[in-house]
Every structure is written in C-alpha cells, then in structure tokens.
Design a protein with these regions (language model features):
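N-terminal membrane-anchoring/stem segments of glycan-assembly enzymes
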Residues: 1-82, 135, 345-349, 471-507, ...
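Basic/Trp-rich segment in TM-proximal cytosolic loops or flexible interdomain/linker regions
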Residues: 1-13, 32-43, 65-78, 238, ...
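Cell-envelope/extracellular polymer assembly enzymes that use nucleotide-activated donors
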Residues: 84-89, 119, 256, 271
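Short, acidic, metal-binding catalytic loop of nucleotide-sugar glycosyltransferases
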Residues: 103-117
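A conserved acidic beta->alpha catalytic loop
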Residues: 123-131, 147-148
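Long helical/loop segments within the catalytic core of UDP-sugar-dependent glycosyltransferases
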Residues: 144-167, 179-266, 277-278, 299-338
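Catalytic donor-sugar/metal-binding loop of nucleotide-sugar-dependent glycosyltransferases
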Residues: 264, 273-291
Length: 528
C-alpha cells in the first residue's frame, strides 16, 4: 500500500515538473512573433488558456498531495448522553405528491433512539392544498408562505423562524434519506468542536442523463460521484467543504451566527456553507451515501440546473467577495475560488475545439516551432497528466470522460457564464423538474445539437484540408493540427450521439436491484 501511494506521489510530482517545463517552453519558444499581429494575438489567447488549465491541474494535484482523501471515521452514537431534538426540513415548490411521499416515508423511517424527537416539516413554497393534505395524511408538519422571496433559502429561513430544535437536517423533495442518516451525522457534533454541518453524498435511483443517453448504465459512475467522493472528501483538510443544499445536518447555532441561509445568489447552498465556515465552524464531508434521489431525465431541466449552479457561483463571488471575506484562510478562499473558476470550462473547451481550425482551414500559425522538439516536450507531459489523473481517481472519473462531459455542456454554459460574469445577472430561481415524460426533442436540446453539429462539420473540414495539404507540403507542418482535429471530432461525435438520444424515461421504470461498484444501486429497466 505504501509503494502504491509512493508511486502516485511520484507521478504527481513528475507531472507537475513536466507541466512547468512545457509552459516555459511554450512561452519562450513557440509564439509566432514574426508572423503578424493576428497570429500572435490568437497564439497568446491559446497559450493563456493552456496556462489557465495548468493552474487548475496544479491546484488539483497539490490538493491530492497535501490532503488525506479518506472519509472521516464515524464516531459511535453512544457518545451522546442526552438525545437532542432534530428538525427535518423537506423543501418543495412544485414537485408532485408522489415524489414527496417517498421522501417523507424515508424521513419517518430514519433510525433514532427517540423518534418523538424527530420533527419533520414539509416546507412548501408553492402553498398548495394538496401538499398540506398529504402532510396531514402522513402525520408530519406543514409550513408554507404567501411569497417566494429568496426562493429555497427564503423557504428554509421561514422554517427556521417557526422551529426551535438545536439541529436541522435539510433534504430536497426527491432526496429520500437512508435509515442511518441521523446516526451517521449527529455524533460528529459531540465528538469534535465547532462543527457547523455534516454533508453526505447523494446517489440516485435512476441513471443520470449521461449514463442513460450514452447507454452506459452501470458502466460509468454517476457524473456527480467525482465531486462527492473525491473533491469533497479532500476539502475536509482545508475546512472548505461545500454545502450542497440537501443531505446535510446543521447545528442551529451555526446558522444563527451566519444569519440564516444565505440569500441573494442562485447558489444559496454553497454560499451558506462558506459563511458558516467563515464564522469559525467546521464543515465535514463523508463518503457514505446519505440519500437516494431522482436524476434529471430531460435535457432542458438539466441545462437549467447547471446554468443555475454556474451563475450562482459567479453571483456568490461578486456578492461575498470571496478573496476578501473575513474569517476564511487563504486556502479556504482559494478552494471556494476554484468552485467558481470551474464553471468557466466551457470557454476554455470552445477555444480548444476551434483552435486547430485556425491553421488547417485558414492557414494561421499559432504555434511556431520545430515539430520534433514540440512533440518531445508536449507528448510526455500530456500522457503523464492523463495517466496521473486516471490512476488517482480510479473508476470515479477518467480524463476522457471529463472531456466528453465538458464538450456536451460547452454550448449550454459558455456564453451564459460569460454573460453573468460581465454583469447580465439571472435572478429567477428555476426549480429543477425531476420526472417528465416527453418524447419530442426539446428546444434547448435542438440548440445544443446545432452547436455540436456545426463544430463537428468545421472539424471534419479542417481534418480533410489537413490531409489534402499534406500532398503539397511536408506532413510535419500539419501533424499537430491533424491529431488535435481528430481528437475534437471524437468528442463532438459522442456529444452528437448524446443529443440525438433525446427520449426521456420515467424514473419509476427503474427499480433498486443490488449493490454495484459504481452507482451503489444497480438498476434494471422494467419490461412493459
């Protein structure tokens, strides 16, 4: 085991060294300084994108080297002398009673020494009579309000004013907690000092949109597993654990000191966790599944969800001024800045999809160097980085799948993130529908498909022109553009396949079967 860790450490260090060498080489030996202003400007843009990607790579690898990715050990529940009361908030706005019934039943089935001390509240921002009747039928509490000010955060803050237990668990309407959720989370508040919240991962009873559309159910992990089981766990070291809006247990005092759930951004959850941690409280992330929810099953809802997350993080940056906020250490600030910078990947990916076409189609040189020298420096760096990422993350995320996810999402996020950053603020909070049945291609899906098709055709043209020009020129002049364009064609082809498999499914057609190494629940499609 020690040799395995040492090997991973060596790979990380070597990758970092080679990346530094490559960037230095790119800056001083590859810019087309004598080929005109246009070539130089475009070359600098591409170089800056490479440096930006390398900084993200550095941040990630350093976190891996300096942190322990093991989940904190769960303390024994018997350390608690007096069993406290716990309020359970289930947030809802327009979700169906069927979805809520499943979550309420799971909350009522949570194990606890004294179940009379579990107080379940359905926090209905839709103020619906049918939901009120459901809570009466299921013998749980109902809280509503006449307006939707501050959306989900306002909903929770309204519930805070009407409850008084020292601990508060929060769940989305579709997130059915595991039986041992409270027995897993509560002991941390007694075994450690100043714990503000404990965050557990989520899993799903149906395949995510990538697994389903690409026919990879149980062959690849849930897209969010990488975040919950790798990135979040590493954040324990720097006390920068992200509150994800559901599957968490808070101390009421920490929320009181943070002035309740954060408002004014579309990502009230991340902002709330950050403010709680800035007040001196600790956030703890565990590797143990805390609830099973329902994955978004249509692209329009998925796109709105990711857009809300992206724009919300940028709004958080602007409102709370992460780099100057009081109470956070430098490393905490950098960790939260990485949450923001991540969402700009669409801009970077779009530049990579277009960059090789500058030379293959328009003949604009953006890398001016000896090809053999370039390959001898770039290839080992590229291979080692990919190998390093793959061996570190194992089956959670591969570099290939990471590029597939980014290519699919680029048309969705690229310009919206840029618009939010320069000041076009989105204020409406779109609740994500979790189960829809529609067998026609949505408008958003068509828009994204048109983007992917356009980029695919451009790269095909570039690829053909590379081949054609080889007959008139030395192959060395085109091999870099040739390989780069071929790579883009592969990722864009997968994206088009994703776009074309647009038929949605009903999550009820998926039922739990057995534990498996990826999704924790193997899922079988019921034959109708």
């Amino acid at each position: 085991m020690k040799l395995k860790k040492l090997f991973k450490f060596a790979i990380c260090i070597l990758s970092l060294i080679l990346t530094i060498i490559y960037i230095i080489y790119r800056i001083f030996y590859t810019l087309p300084t004598s080929l005109g202003a246009l070539s130089l400007i475009l070359a600098i843009i591409i170089l800056l994108v490479e440096i930006w990607e390398s900084i993200d790579f550095f941040t990630y690898f350093i976190n891996i080297l300096l942190t322990n990715k093991k989940s904190p050990k769960i303390p024994n529940f018997n350390i608690i002398n007096e069993i406290p009361d716990i309020d359970v908030f289930i947030a809802t706005y327009n979700e169906s009673p069927n979805i809520l019934t499943r979550t309420i039943e799971a909350c009522k089935n949570m194990e606890y020494p004294d179940k009379n001390k579990i107080h379940i509240y359905v926090c209905d921002d839709g103020d619906r009579l049918e939901i009120k009747n459901l809570t009466i039928k299921m013998d749980v509490n109902y809280i509503s309000r006449s307006n939707r000010k501050d959306a989900k955060a306002g909903n929770y803050n309204n519930a805070l004013l009407k409850t008084n237990s020292p601990y508060i668990a929060t769940f989305d309407s579709d997130m059915a907690p595991t039986k041992d959720f409270l027995l897993t989370t509560l002991p941390f508040f007694y075994s450690e000092k100043n714990v503000g919240f404990v965050q557990l991962p989520q899993s799903f009873i149906n395949p995510d949109i990538f697994q389903y559309r690409l026919k990879m159910q149980n062959k690849i992990p849930f897209e969010q597993d990488y975040f919950y089981h790798s990135i979040q766990i590493a954040k324990n070291k720097t006390n920068s654990v992200v509150y994800c809006g559901t599957n968490a247990l808070f101390s009421r005092q920490s929320l009181k000191d943070a002035n309740g759930f954060a408002t004014g951004t579309l990502s009230e959850d991340i902002a709330t966790g950050m403010i709680v941690e800035s007040k001196g409280y600790k956030g703890i992330a565990l590797n143990k599944i805390g609830a099973y929810g329902i994955c978004v099953n249509d692209f329009s809802a998925f796109a709105k969800q990711r857009t809300r997350w992206a724009r919300g993080c940028i709004q958080m940056l602007k409102k709370y001024k992460i780099l100057t906020i009081k109470g956070l250490s430098v490393r905490q600030k950098l960790e939260y800045m990485s949450c923001v910078s991540y969402w700009f990947f669409g801009i970077r990916r779009l530049i990579y999809l277009l960059a090789p076409l500058l030379f293959s189609i328009f003949g604009i040189i953006v890398v001016d160097c000896n090809l053999l020298t370039f390959i001898s420096i770039w290839l080992p760096t590229y291979v080692l980085k990919r190998f390093g990422l793959d061996i570190i993350e194992g089956n959670k995320r591969s570099s290939t799948w990471n590029k597939i996810y980014e290519t699919i999402l680029t048309p969705v996020l690229c310009f919206k993130v840029l618009a939010e950053f320069i000041g076009f603020k989105q204020t409406n909070f779109n609740v994500t529908p979790k189960n829809t049945s529609n067998y026609t291609m949505e408008k958003e899906n068509k828009k994204v498909l048109s983007w992917h098709l356009s980029l695919f055709i451009l790269n095909i043209i570039g690829f053909i022109m590379c081949i054609a020009r080889v007959y008139d020129n030395s192959i060395e002049n085109y091999i870099l553009s040739f390989v780069w364009t071929f790579s883009n064609i592969f990722y864009l082809f997968i994206s088009i396949v994703f776009d074309l498999r647009y038929k949605r499914y009903d999550y009820k057609n998926f039922v739990p079967n057995k534990i498996n190494k990826y999704s924790k629940l193997a899922l079988i499609r019921r034959e109708k």
